[in-house]
Design a protein with these regions (language model features):
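General structural signal for secondary-structure boundaries
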Residues: 18-19, 42, 172, 198
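Terminal amphipathic helices with adjacent charged low-complexity linkers/tails
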Residues: 1-17
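Intrinsic-disorder/low-complexity coil detector
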Residues: 18-19, 54, 170, 191
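Active-site diphosphate/adenylate-binding microenvironment
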Residues: 21-103
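Thiamine diphosphate
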Residues: 3-6, 69-70, 75-198
């Protein structure tokens, strides 16, 4: 049932020994990612924790990658008009600017942007606008070393990964080395923002 699936997703951890959910060409990537970046936290476990910890009247926004699917499956809104998800076109880069506009519309309610690292890299310039205008938005950045959802779509069709994972180039000329470790909290240094990480 849904409650059992929610508990499974909410408690999921990952390491290099976790068996893949789908056995395809991408099966070893998640374990390698956990090893290279020293992380066992899954997106679903992070979403469960965020959902429990934020104010019950907070408004969340998202739009691209695997977050819309995971949030549709897992997110438990506690008040009306608190869930804003762009499903139609998976508009990468919308999450930060959308959160700024949303915060301007909802006033005192806390606003949380759920954004993947690929989308954040594409367009996070409105973070500076939020600072300039003294508009508080909360950015929850999910790092899956690039464009994980697009990578899953590529490899799920039997293709090799085509630069959708942020990996170092090896002597072969391919981007199949270890994963890059990007300090996304460091991106906001020099801006008067508060940085937290898990």
């Amino acid at each position: 049932d849904w409650e059992a699936e929610l508990a499974r997703l909410d408690g999921m951890v990952y390491d290099q020994n976790t068996p893949p959910l789908i056995n395809d060409r991408n099966a070893e990537s998640a374990g390698q990612y956990a090893l290279d970046l020293g992380s066992a936290l899954t997106q679903t476990a992070a979403l469960g924790a965020i959902n429990r910890l934020i104010p019950k009247d907070a408004v969340v926004i998202g739009s691209s990658g695997s977050l819309p699917g995971d949030m549709q499956r897992m997110w438990r809104p506690y008040s009306p008009d608190s869930y804003n998800m762009e499903y139609g076109y998976s508009c990468m880069g919308y999450e930060v600017s959308g959160a700024l506009g949303q915060k301007m519309a909802v006033g005192e309610k806390e606003t949380y942007s759920m954004v993947g690292d690929g989308s954040f890299v594409m367009l996070h310039s409105e973070l500076l606008t939020a600072v300039q205008e003294k508009i508080k938005i909360n950015i929850c950045l999910f790092d899956n070393a690039g464009f994980g959802c697009i990578n899953n779509l590529q490899t799920g069709q039997g293709n090799d990964s085509l630069c959708t994972e942020l990996r170092y180039r090896t002597a072969t000329g391919k981007h199949d080395g270890s994963f890059l470790h990007v300090d996304y909290r460091g991106v906001s240094k020099g801006r008067p923002v508060r940085r937290l990480g898990v």
